[in-house]
């Protein structure tokens, strides 16, 4: 039996199509589910089973006007969405800092880099420099990929050099780690983190 | 010259009262500054100098109604403050996960435990279990203390046992690590993290 380092047994993943999955439908748009919902379920699974503590950060909001009615809760009457200067998810696995962003595309040929903005790339570079484990989870072409931040940086810099504004399907399949979707956890990205950063044959530190 | 592990030189702290500090005033309420502002400045200092990447999480808000006017930004028309289930600050230092909450009290005799709620304590326990570095920064009695989460747990559990709903001044001075306030960084909590978790004489892992 495969066990996580904390001694918890690893629950084997089930193929798409069992239980709540509708057979034959694999893209998020078709399934009526979202990448975010699947990641929240995954993080909840990690938390409950003591595998990792990873949370999605709240949506950043600029609050302009708040009403404080008597005998009831404060009501925010005017606020605006702010662009985040960091990534959406972070937390801890085996003491190490984990930081990632999740994105999906409906394009069938490539993943557009406009899904990220300069501030986020800058943040990811700072995290890598500080020894954190940083990556992006990309849902594209009917699959979900784990792309290490260092690879994203390569494509980001190339955009500046030759103007190519996307990662082609072939490139993503080559640089990314394909994740098999399961029932619970749905997107077992910690398995990839474990392989890349903690196993004996780890390519990374 | 003292250097951080990344080779950056340590900027010696300056006593309270120099530059923008008004001599003789040491509590946040008197100075017209907030603990949060000082921590934001400190985190900015760490970021710019490549010492650590720590951010305050956005305030969690439950969005109920959003207006999408033509040709201008979406306006949130109704939203409510939500209780956070985690702590306010997290990030990475030398690869390790850092997680903390900051609180201040105007009480002159003790620090009330009602500043925390069960969900936050639960989160801090999960972080500790996962090998993260977790603590609280408490501004009280004219000083700022770094209290390891494990000590906070002790006082939290005692509350359940004998009903004492606060940490006395003496107890905080005994269990907490007094931080000298500086000009930049203002509250050098990473110095305490370094001593407790990374130096040869580290009491912790």
Swiss-Prot record, chains A, B:
It is found in: Cytoplasm. It is an enzyme of class 3 (hydrolase). It comes from Bacillus pumilus (strain SAFR-032). Binds 1 Mg(2+) ion per subunit. It catalyses: Endonucleolytic cleavage at a junction such as a reciprocal single-stranded crossover between two homologous DNA duplexes (Holliday junction). One of its GO terms (biological process) is DNA recombination. Keywords: Cytoplasm, DNA damage, DNA recombination, DNA repair, Endonuclease, Hydrolase, Magnesium, Metal-binding, Nuclease. GO terms for cellular component: cytoplasm. It comes from the Bacteria. Its EC number is 3.1.21.10. Its cofactor is Mg(2+). The keyword Oxidoreductase does not apply. This is Holliday junction resolvase RecU. The record marks 103 as: Transition state stabilizer. InterPro entries: Resolv_RecU, Restrct_endonuc-II-like, tRNA_endonuc-like_dom_sf.
């Amino acid at each position: 039996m495969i066990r996580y380092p904390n001694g918890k047994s690893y629950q084997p993943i089930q193929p798409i199509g069992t239980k709540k999955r509708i057979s034959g439908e694999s893209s998020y748009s078709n399934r009526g589910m979202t990448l975010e919902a699947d990641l929240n379920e995954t993080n909840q699974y990690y938390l409950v089973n003591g595998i990792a503590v990873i949370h999605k950060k709240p949506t950043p909001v600029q609050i302009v006007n708040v009403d404080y009615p008597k005998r009831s809760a404060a009501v925010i009457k005017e606020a605006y969405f702010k662009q985040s200067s960091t990534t959406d998810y972070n937390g801890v696995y085996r003491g190490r800092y984990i930081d990632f962003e999740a994105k999906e595309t409906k394009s069938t040929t490539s993943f557009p880099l406009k899904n990220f903005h300069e501030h986020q790339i800058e943040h990811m570079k700072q995290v890598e420099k500080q020894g954190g484990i940083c990556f992006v989870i990309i849902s594209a072409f009917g699959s979900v990929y784990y792309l290490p931040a260092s690879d994203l940086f390569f494509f980001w810099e190339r955009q500046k050099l030759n103007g190519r504004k996307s990662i082609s399907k072939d490139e993503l399949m080559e640089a990314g780690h394909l994740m098999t979707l399961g029932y619970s956890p749905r997107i077992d990205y910690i398995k990839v983190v474990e392989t890349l950063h903690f196993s004996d044959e780890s390519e990374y530190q």
